[in-house]
Amino acid sequence: MRSFSKILAVASLAAIANSAVLKRDNNVLEVTLVAGENAVVHASVKNVGAEDLNLLSYGSLFDTAPVQKINVYEGETAVPFKGVLRAIQRTDLAPEVFHTLAAGETFETSFNAAEVHDLSTSTYTFVAEGAIPFAKAGSTEISDSIIFKSNAITVSVDGEAAKSVAKAIPSSIDRRTVLQSGCSTSQRSATTQALSYCASLARAASTAASSGSSTKFSEYFKTTSSSTRSVVAARLSAVASQCSSLTSGSTKYYCTDVYGYCESNVLAYTIPSTNEIVNCPIYYSALPALTGTCHAQDRATTTLHEFTHAPATYSPGTADNGYGYAAATALTSARAVLNADSYALYANAIYVGC
């Protein structure tokens, strides 16, 4: 897997924030994109429902971090995302991780897609799509997810101008700095255990995807097609391989916050462009090593979740299209196959017997 020289070089973890019930009416949030200069996007989110909403900011248009706010396509091909994918604790959420959007209120933001995508001179399609977990106004307990999809905009990009935009994530970081902040004895022990459990869970889930119950597979991936089962099995097998070694592999695993994205309730995060995975302090303090409860979070499935994000594990890497059982099982098959939590939830279900 990688090497434990203060950094736990290897691959993954992180489970993510999410909702519990089912998706709401797609029309509750009206998301609109408008093209700005070159790769700049102006986005608005309007609450067109009758109730105030407390929306989880992480991983959405409300997030100030370089997260995947839009999907970028060149023709039919998705342009790789080069920002950060953060895993969020689903319980005991802090008030500051939410954005309250009153009924009838509109939130506006602008960002440059070139900060987290490599764009050349070409024509691209930008669209925002996903599921935002929310709590009732005044509460921080996730009650459901809202599925949304914006209009698609066509953008002509000047490649030279796009290249001049500073990247949100550098291509590499100072390894000496990483080596100065290493794993404690307890962190190393917890991470090693999580990796071992991750390998076992991923291996069992891979076998189940190949030849197990088609009904159970369809529950999480919305199809029983042999081609999709093969892809899911292969990705899980690759995760098992990465989790099985501490001294070799294609990803790097850190016990400390080398990029500075461990904010409130963040368990871990992945930088897909560099195949780096980072544990946050609450990964160790808030999660059990392995849960026996259906669809609950633990260190093992958080690690499995993060491994699927890294394209070096299996390409393409997954995204965070839906957090938690309710949102993940509301996805289409095409989006579920590229959703990290779908793999974590499926592996948990196979292990627990959900």
From Swiss-Prot:
UniProt keyword annotation of Zinc present:
yes
The Swiss-Prot or TrEMBL record lists the needed cofactor(s) as: Zn(2+)
Prodomain residues: 20-179
Q: How is the cofactor bound?
A: Binds 1 zinc ion per subunit.
User: In the UniProt record, which is one GO cellular component term?
Assistant: extracellular region
Q: What is its EC number?
A: 3.4.24.39
Q: From the UniProt record, list the reaction(s) this protein catalyses.
A: Preferential cleavage of bonds with hydrophobic residues in P1'. Also 3-Asn-|-Gln-4 and 8-Gly-|-Ser-9 bonds in insulin B chain
Where does the signal peptide begin and end? 1-19
Q: From the UniProt record, which GO molecular function terms apply?
A: metal ion binding; metalloendopeptidase activity
InterPro entries, from UniProt? Answer: Fungal_M35_metalloproteases, MetalloPept_cat_dom_sf, Peptidase_M35
Checking CDD domains in the record gives: M35_deuterolysin_like (cd11008)
A Gene Ontology biological process noted in the UniProt record is: proteolysis
| Residues annotated as catalytic | 306
Give the highest taxon in the source lineage.
Answer: Eukaryota
State whether keyword Zinc applies.
yes
Cross-referenced PROSITE patterns:
ZINC_PROTEASE
UniProt-annotated binding residues for Zn(2+): 305, 309, 320
- Its chief place of residence is secreted
Gene3D superfamilies this protein is in?
A: 2.60.40.2970, Collagenase (Catalytic Domain) (3.40.390.10)
Give the family this protein belongs to, as stated in its UniProt record: Belongs to the peptidase M35 family.
What is the name attached to this protein's record? Neutral protease 2 homolog BCIN_12g06300
The species this protein was found in? Botryotinia fuckeliana (strain B05.10) (Noble rot fungus)
Taxonomic lineage from the root: Eukaryota, Fungi, Dikarya, Ascomycota, Pezizomycotina
